[in-house]
């Protein structure tokens, strides 16, 4: 089999005041290679999104969303150091359609590592009161000195179940610069709104 890695866990989002969202990610990470499967705690991520511009009439919002990933992983399942991300996001809503995206600078210290730019864009449409679908494209620079940048494409959905639950899913191909076989990314989550 091929090598793979990923994580599962809990992401907590809290809005203590209007225009501010605090996010903490508490992952359980895994990695699989020819020697078998390894599980353990992943790196904890913490960020704060501050919406500094919002216009209901135009349906336009701008936000900064800086974050840190703390070196809390066990069993070599994390970065091994604190990393940071300094992005800016924009969103435009028009009826049942939304276009959103942005990007920023990733701070990735460490031997053979490098800082890099990353960003993406998505378009979504509310198909019904319960179902939203969308398409996304993301681009990331190389995160190591000898590494390659990558591009991923995806289709996603949010299905609003009975209150307070939402089911989120997305997936699609990923392409590394320099060729080679395409990879695949997949995300699924159960949202709970309290």
Question: Where in this protein do the model-derived segments appear?
Answer:
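Transmembrane beta-barrel domains of Gram-negative outer membranes and organellar outer membranes
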Residues: 1-194
């Amino acid at each position: 089999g091929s090598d793979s890695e990923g994580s599962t866990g809990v992401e907590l989002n809290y809005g203590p005041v209007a225009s501010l969202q605090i996010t903490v990610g508490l992952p359980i990470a895994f990695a699989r290679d020819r020697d078998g499967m390894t599980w353990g705690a992943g790196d904890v991520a913490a960020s704060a999104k501050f919406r500094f511009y919002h216009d209901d009439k135009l349906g336009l919002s701008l936000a900064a969303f800086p974050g840190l990933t703390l070196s809390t992983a066990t069993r070599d399942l994390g970065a091994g150091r604190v990393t940071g991300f300094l992005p800016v996001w924009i969103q435009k809503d028009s009826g049942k359609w939304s276009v959103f995206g942005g990007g920023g600078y990733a701070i990735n210290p460490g031997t053979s590592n490098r800082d890099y730019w990353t960003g993406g864009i998505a378009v979504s449409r509310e198909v019904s009161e319960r179902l939203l679908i969308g398409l996304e494209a993301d681009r990331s620079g190389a995160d190591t000195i000898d590494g390659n940048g990558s591009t991923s494409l995806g289709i996603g959905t949010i299905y609003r179940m009975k209150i307070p639950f939402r089911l989120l899913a997305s997936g699609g191909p990923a392409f590394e610069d320099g060729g080679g076989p395409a990879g695949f990314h997949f995300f699924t989550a159960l949202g709970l709104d309290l």
